[in-house]
Amino acid sequence: MNVSNNSNMDHNDLAKRGESLIRKSTNRYLTTVRIAFRAKQRRFDDFDGLLEESAIKPVQRSIIELSDEQDQPDLLPG
């Protein structure tokens, strides 16, 4: 999935990723809070100029990132 271009983003894929995060979690509330916290971090990173300008919204980006982390834990450092 191309994260940098909003026109290429498949909203059905985004919905499936969000549902997958909720379904695989043990606590739906904490998962929702993690998504919101990650989105808030991305939003402030965008304001600080730490991230390149992106057409994708912070909540959408956080769902994609958390879904990728959940589905591919071997890609995480550490």
Swiss-Prot record:
It catalyses: RNA(n) + a ribonucleoside 5'-triphosphate = RNA(n+1) + diphosphate. NCBIfam families: PRK00392.2-5. Keywords: DNA-directed RNA polymerase, Nucleotidyltransferase, Transcription, Transferase. This is DNA-directed RNA polymerase subunit omega. One of its GO terms (cellular component) is DNA-directed RNA polymerase complex. In cyanobacteria the RNAP catalytic core is composed of 2 alpha, 1 beta, 1 beta', 1 gamma and 1 omega subunit. When a sigma factor is associated with the core the holoenzyme is formed, which can initiate transcription. It is an enzyme of class 2 (transferase). Belongs to the RNA polymerase subunit omega family. Pfam families: RNA_pol_Rpb6. The lineage of its organism: Bacteria, Bacillati, Cyanobacteriota, Cyanophyceae, Synechococcales. InterPro entries: DNA-dir_RNA_pol_omega, Pol_omega/Rpo6/RPB6. One of its GO terms (molecular function) is DNA-directed RNA polymerase activity. It comes from Prochlorococcus marinus subsp. pastoris (strain CCMP1986 / NIES-2087 / MED4). Promotes RNA polymerase assembly. Latches the N- and C-terminal regions of the beta' subunit thereby facilitating its interaction with the beta and alpha subunits. GO terms for biological process: DNA-templated transcription. Its EC number is 2.7.7.6.
